[in-house]
UniProtKB/Swiss-Prot annotation:
Role of this protein: Required for maturation of 30S ribosomal subunits.
Assigned keywords, A-Z: Cytoplasm, Ribosome biogenesis
Family designation: Belongs to the RimP family.
Statement: the UniProt record of this protein carries the keyword Cytoplasm: yes
GO cellular component assignments: cytosol
BP term (GO), one: translation
Name of the coding gene: rimP
Cell location: Cytoplasm
Name of this chain's protein: Ribosome maturation factor RimP
Signal peptide: none
Protein's organism: Desulforamulus reducens (strain ATCC BAA-1160 / DSM 100696 / MI-1) (Desulfotomaculum reducens)
Gene3D superfamilies: Ribosome maturation factor RimP, C-terminal domain (2.30.30.180), RimP-like superfamily, N-terminal (3.30.300.70)
Pfam short name (any one): DUF150_C
CDD domains tied to this protein: YlxS_C
Membrane-spanning residues: none
Length: 153
């Protein structure tokens, strides 16, 4: 089974559990690292999540995944916060973090670069609008590989 199929099935299955706990389902990843498979579920809420949030949701998700068995091989389940460099995937993510520093990578170089760090100005049908060193840059949606919050030091 393709990784994307696993992610889609798990996302669909766990979303009601996360919503019932009044939390946001930020992302689901299914990755192989060092010979082991990991199913990572990232959750959040205003003000940030606590260990109890992760534990409560993890237990319910674990039980559900045992029942529906959407993953073809053994894996480790991890439920956690998305962290300070959280991914931005949905339009609502970009709206929520408008004005924040973001790090965006593209599939192919745009003006000679595939990595862009700048202030998020807007997200619309045109693309993702950033301010980088005082200049506005628009990255078309179809060119964006990943988008994350960036840490200002």
């Amino acid at each position: 089974m393709a990784k994307s199929t696993v992610v889609e099935k798990v996302t669909e299955a766990v979303a009601p559990i996360v919503e019932e706990a009044k939390l946001e389902l930020v992302d689901v990843e299914y990755v192989k690292e060092g010979g082991n498979w990991y199913l990572r579920i990232f959750i959040d809420k205003p003000g940030g999540i606590e260990l109890d949030d992760c534990q409560g949701v993890s237990e319910k998700i674990d039980t559900l995944l045992d029942e529906i068995d959407p993953v073809p091989q053994a894996y480790f389940l991890e439920v956690s916060s998305p962290g300070i460099e959280r991914p931005l995937k949905k339009p609502q993510d970009f709206e929520k973090f408008n004005g924040h520093l973001v790090n965006i990578t593209t599939f192919a170089p745009i003006n000679g670069s595939k990595n862009f760090i700048g202030k998020l100005l807007d997200y619309n049908e045109e693309g993702i609008h950033l301010e980088i060193k005082g200049k506005q840059v628009v990255l078309p949606h179809q060119q964006v590989a990943t988008a994350r919050l960036a840490v200002e030091i």
